[in-house]
């Protein structure tokens, strides 16, 4: 009996990595506009929302999480990035809103990752008051697996932001090089013209 129970716990732990919904978005929020992402989440599920402003102005934006009963469960102003983990009180559609209303001219590009956990036997074990040493170990490992998944998602988002920054820098360097080349060519043409005029005037004298 104990072996069967332990086997079930181990299988549940190994399946945690696949028993969650992970959605990733990159989108533009225009100036003076608010954009929202809607996700239906079941009752008593843990969900993690991660975002980063990867381009635009001072790379800041207002971020709000709204529950299905229209209650604001989190609100942050002028944030460049953030990670928020919550547990759903009841089932329904949650809203994740990004407001760029503070900006009158500049659009913002946002990278957003939403990870929603699924129910599993691990959750039922967590409700027990008295846990065996094996169950406590499984719970600790479960929390560790979830933390690693969230870190992977976070680094994926940061990698996208750094890639965007590198591409933007490369573009600026390219155009600056083109501008420098144009200036050098213009100066060379002017110097040739000036020297020719100088010697023509000197011969005439």
Swiss-Prot record:
Keywords: Cytoplasmic vesicle, Membrane, Protein transport, Signal, Transmembrane, Transmembrane helix, Transport. It holds the Pfam family EMP24_GP25L. Belongs to the EMP24/GP25L family. Could have a role in the budding of coatomer-coated and other species of coated vesicles. GO terms for cellular component: COPII-coated ER to Golgi transport vesicle; cytoplasmic vesicle membrane; endoplasmic reticulum; endoplasmic reticulum-Golgi intermediate compartment; Golgi apparatus. Residues 25-172 are lumenal. It is a single-pass type I membrane protein. InterPro entries: Emp24-like, GOLD_dom, GOLD_dom_sf. Residues 194-205 are cytoplasmic. The keyword 4Fe-4S does not apply. Residues 34-116 form the GOLD domain. Residues 1-24 form the signal peptide. The chain crosses the membrane at residues 173-193. It is found in: Cytoplasmic vesicle membrane. This is Transmembrane emp24 domain-containing protein A. GO terms for biological process: endoplasmic reticulum to Golgi vesicle-mediated transport; Golgi organization; intracellular protein transport.
């Amino acid at each position: 009996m104990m072996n069967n129970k332990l086997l079930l716990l181990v299988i549940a732990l190994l399946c945690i990595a696949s028993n969650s919904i992970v959605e990733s978005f990159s989108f533009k929020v225009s100036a003076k506009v608010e954009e929202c992402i809607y996700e239906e989440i079941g009752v008593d599920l843990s969900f993690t929302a991660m975002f980063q402003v990867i381009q635009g102005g001072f790379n800041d934006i207002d971020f709000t999480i709204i529950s299905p009963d229209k209650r604001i469960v989190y609100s942050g102003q002028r944030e460049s990035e953030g990670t928020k983990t919550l547990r759903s009180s009841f089932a329904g559609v949650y809203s994740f809103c990004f407001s760029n209303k503070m900006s009158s001219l500049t659009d913002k590009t946002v990278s957003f990752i939403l990870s929603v956990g699924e129910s599993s036997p691990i959750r039922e074990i967590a409700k027990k008051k008295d846990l065996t040493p094996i169950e406590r170990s499984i719970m600790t490992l479960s929390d560790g697996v979830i933390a690693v998944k969230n870190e992977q998602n976070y680094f994926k988002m940061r990698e996208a932001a750094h890639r965007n920054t590198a591409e933007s820098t490369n573009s600026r360097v390219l155009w600056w090089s083109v501008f420098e080349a144009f200036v050098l060519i213009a100066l060379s043409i002017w110097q040739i013209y000036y020297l020719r005029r100088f010697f023509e005037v000197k011969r005439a004298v």
